Amino acid sequence: MKLKEVLKKLEYNILNGNIEIDIENIQYDSRNIKKNDIFFAIQGYSTDGHKFIESAIEKGAKVIVFDKGFENENMYKDITFIKVKNSRKALAVAASNYYGNPKDKLKLIGVTGTNGKTTSTFMIKSILEEAGFKVGLMGTILNYIGDRKIYAQRTTPESLEIHKLFKDMVDSGVDYCVMEVSSHSLYLDRVYGIEFNEGIFTNLTQDHLDFHKTFENYYNSKLMLFKNSINSVINIDDNYGERILKEIEEKTFTYSIKKYSDLKAESVRLHSRGGEFTVDFKGNKEKINIHIPGEYNVSNALGSILACVNEGISLKVIKRGLEKLSGVPGRCEIVTMGYNLGYDVIVDYAHTPDGLDNVLRTARDFTKGKLISVYGCGGDRDRAKRPIMGRIGTELSDLAILTSDNPRTEEPFSIIDDIVKGVTKDNYIIVQSRREAIKKAMTIAKKDDVIVVAGKGHEDYQILKDKTIHFDEREVIKEIIEELY
């Protein structure tokens, strides 16, 4: 492909070489460079791609795109150097050009918020498929192209991978792509230049302050989605949803369980396996059943319903789509069904104060016996939330078992010490090994008790100081059942 075609719609200065040359592939990781590739030097979270420009050239890069700090271009007469204002934004535009601008051939629905992104995208996918569309999904758990699964490395990939996935979706006949859009991806321009048909806001609570530094920065990152959405679908039960309404001029639609809104849930009834509620949209009423418990999942369903109504899908089709979704991996997932233990074990991804609060309150509503929680906090992440989660877990549980959760480079007991600082009750024990903590809970549990294992959900790994090990809580719980019973 001609370099000038890759650089379409970009403002740039040619410092050396020319743009009439052919290039092979686009790369932002110098380790992947091959002969005649174009290398985009981007600032990463922990390292700066500009440090690897010379390494990329040695490996065969023909073109270097950068935005700062490289002054040796005159040393490389055969290399084309392109200076841009922002190499991350340039990468996003170039990636789209390189893959034939597949984003323009898809209808895109983006979901952002601290919690609820994954569940919402699975709900929307199920509804759209019930309406007869072929659907792609990008998310925390998996990427889907129709029924084909592609395992995800992070919530939102880099822009290069996004546009490659878009192309694969277009080539496979996908009509809609439903995306989890993280605050990182918005701030780091991974979704730069993408216009969404529907942008959905679920909620905003404390998380990622290790990255964003302040809550205001975190909010402003989320806000960016709605400046690039045709329709904005906003949860006004969340105070930040109310604020978004005041700050964006785009077409807005509201949903709520508690307030007057464009779409409101009425007659909400919750139970241990899900819930039911009625929606009324412009005089059309429909009773909806969902198979994921918790009031917060009624809220996730409302956002999904409203976005799909905006896309012209009837409430009857939406009802069928939601009722066909049996659950979402690692989201309030009861993993002991069929074992007849007398108690339930729930696995949930809750790794934020609000997420932990939600899942424990939901479990409490259907717990006849004692509620036991097993959780920790991730290492090298927002330390401020640790004592808050310590307080929430002990206040809402009869017994909290504090343990490890991806400690990364930190000492596990140091993280647990931070959690304990927020504890105001003495109903907790510390079991540093996550497997042993789960086993301890299952040893203690009696008839009608509920155990909530929070923090990892769908994850099948544990990140330690010097390695990542396989750790799937469903498998672990099954092994423990075989050991104990």
Curated annotation (Swiss-Prot):
| Positions bearing N6-carboxylysine | K222
Tell me the residue numbers annotated for binding UDP-N-acetyl-alpha-D-muramoyl-L-alanyl-D-glutamate. Answer: S30, T155, T156, S182, R190
Q: Does the keyword section mention Cytoplasm?
A: yes
Q: Which residues bind ATP?
A: G113, T114, N115, G116, K117, T118, T119
Compartments reported by the entry: Cytoplasm
User: Which Pfam families does the UniProt record give?
Assistant: Mur_ligase, Mur_ligase_C, Mur_ligase_M
- Report which reactions are catalysed by this protein: UDP-N-acetyl-alpha-D-muramoyl-L-alanyl-D-glutamate + meso-2,6-diaminopimelate + ATP = UDP-N-acetyl-alpha-D-muramoyl-L-alanyl-gamma-D-glutamyl-meso-2,6-diaminopimelate + ADP + phosphate + H(+)
* GO CC aspect terms: cytoplasm
Its post-translational modification remark reads: Carboxylation is probably crucial for Mg(2+) binding and, consequently, for the gamma-phosphate positioning of ATP.
Pathway(s) it belongs to: Cell wall biogenesis; peptidoglycan biosynthesis
Predominant location category: cytoplasm
User: What's the EC number here?
Assistant: 6.3.2.13
Motif interval(s): Meso-diaminopimelate recognition motif: 405-408
Q: Which Gene Ontology terms describe the biological processes this protein takes part in?
A: cell division; cell wall organization; peptidoglycan biosynthetic process; regulation of cell shape
Disulfide bond sites = none
Alphabetic keyword roster: ATP-binding, Cell cycle, Cell division, Cell shape, Cell wall biogenesis/degradation, Cytoplasm, Ligase, Magnesium, Nucleotide-binding, Peptidoglycan synthesis
Q: Which cofactor does it need?
A: Mg(2+)
Keyword ATP-binding (UniProt): yes
**Physiological role:** Catalyzes the addition of meso-diaminopimelic acid to the nucleotide precursor UDP-N-acetylmuramoyl-L-alanyl-D-glutamate (UMAG) in the biosynthesis of bacterial cell-wall peptidoglycan.
Similarity field: Belongs to the MurCDEF family. MurE subfamily.
Name of this chain's protein: UDP-N-acetylmuramoyl-L-alanyl-D-glutamate--2,6-diaminopimelate ligase
The organism is Clostridium tetani (strain Massachusetts / E88)
